Regions:
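Conserved beta-strand-loop-beta-strand element in the redox core of flavoprotein oxidoreductases
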Residues: 131-154
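Glycine-rich loop(s) and the adjacent beta-strand/alpha-helix scaffold that form part
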Residues: 162-181
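Hydrophobic/aromatic ligand-binding patch that stacks against planar heteroaromatic rings
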Residues: 30, 34-35, 47, 55, ...
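N-terminal Rossmann-like FAD-binding beta1-loop-alpha1 element of flavoenzymes
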Residues: 19-43
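Extreme N-terminal leader/targeting segments of oxidoreductases
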Residues: 1-19, 107, 122
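Short hydrophobic core segments
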Residues: 22, 155-165
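Conserved N-terminal/central alpha/beta ligand/cofactor-binding core
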Residues: 8, 40-41, 46-133, 137-139, ...
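Core beta-strand elements of the Rossmann-like FAD/NAD(P) dinucleotide-binding domain
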Residues: 15-17, 150-159
Length: 181
């Protein structure tokens, strides 16, 4: 922000990471965990107070329509093994549909995030802007600006992953975004 605005707004110190993942849902959490396991210092930014994304926010209590491979598949299997909801009246487990309670999903994801010492979770912190370096037709996102506890904070990293589900980071960065078909 311009210098005159900086005087009226309180800023937290700038933080630097190797990877910033915006969106702590079904796409962002596996991305953050795998980056941390590879040795990267990761900021996982979530606008909501709880992690989980749409399965928690909108009570979407089934995972479908996404590839179930790698870490996502392992998390899904653990979730369903420990917390899956089935139709026990019929005595059979369903094929295709996999239901769970959002609270169980939050517990599973939170536990897996806490296991990774290289992840800094910043929940309740909406992204309010992006920092973009102009490189002609190859602009590069170098960081995000978040609103945290009544203060603004800038996070920088060589890699920023937009896992918001809505493409808000891409849109804020000037990318052409299309929704639907």
């Amino acid at each position: 922000p311009p210098a005159e605005r900086r005087k009226s707004v309180s800023f937290y110190p700038v933080l630097n990471f190797d990877v910033i993942v915006v969106g702590a849902g079904p796409g962002g959490i596996p991305a953050a965990i795998r980056a941390a396991q590879a040795g990267a210092k990761v900021a996982l930014v979530e606008e909501d107070l709880a992690v989980g994304g749409a399965p928690v926010d909108m009570y979407v209590t089934t995972l479908f329509g996404q590839p179930s491979v790698g870490l996502s598949k392992a998390l899904e299997q653990e979730l369903l093994r420990d917390h899956g909801l089935y139709n026990y009246e019929s005595g059979t487990k369903p094929k295709g549909w996999r239901f769970f309670l959002p609270s169980a999903y939050v517990r599973l994801l939170s536990r897996n995030i806490r296991k990774e010492k290289n992840i800094t979770l910043l929940s309740g912190t909406p992204v309010i802007g992006t920092m973009v370096v102009d490189k002609g037709n190859r602009n590069r996102v170098t960081g995000v600006r978040i609103y945290r506890n009544g203060h603004i904070q800038e996070l920088y990293a060589p890699v920023t992953i937009d896992a918001t589900g809505t493409g808000v980071v891409a849109a804020m960065s000037g990318c052409v975004c299309m929704y639907g078909s």
